[in-house]
């Protein structure tokens, strides 16, 4: 694996810059069990050595292989609404479900790069 090699993918409504061997957090895929293998086809760009391969909008000959590590819940965020000079106060909490996955390989034209 070259340390200069990375890809930009779209997953879970967000774009992520991914490298082989690193793990990333994305939106909830709790229906997938740990150690489930995943393939991501929505690859926007690949940086290989000193050249860029850019898709319009996706690279049709590229894919990312990875696996699910685990799912968990993020830290609680407290939302507090208050209208001044009124007796309106509302306190609410929210915890986002998150899935952590690891990238096993970046493939371009069927070859692991």
From Swiss-Prot:
GO cellular component, one term: ribosome
Subunit structure: Part of the 50S ribosomal subunit.
Family per record: Belongs to the bacterial ribosomal protein bL21 family.
Keyword list, A-Z: Chloroplast, Plastid, Ribonucleoprotein, Ribosomal protein, RNA-binding, rRNA-binding
Pfam short name (any one): Ribosomal_L21p
Domain of life: Eukaryota
GO BP of this protein: translation
Compartments where located: Plastid, Chloroplast
GO terms, molecular function: rRNA binding; structural constituent of ribosome
Protein name as catalogued: Large ribosomal subunit protein bL21c
UniProt organism field: Chara vulgaris
């Amino acid at each position: 694996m070259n340390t200069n090699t990375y890809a930009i993918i779209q997953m879970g409504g967000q774009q992520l810059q991914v490298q082989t061997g690193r793990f990333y957090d994305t939106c909830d895929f709790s229906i997938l069990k740990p150690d489930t293998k995943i393939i991501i086809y929505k690859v926007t760009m690949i940086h290989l050595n000193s050249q860029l391969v850019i898709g319009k909008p996706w690279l049709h000959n590229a894919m990312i292989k990875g696996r699910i590590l685990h799912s968990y819940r993020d830290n609680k965020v407290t939302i507090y609404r208050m209208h001044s000079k009124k007796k309106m106060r509302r306190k609410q909490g929210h915890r986002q479900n998150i899935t952590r996955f690891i990238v096993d390989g970046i493939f371009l034209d069927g070859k692991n790069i």
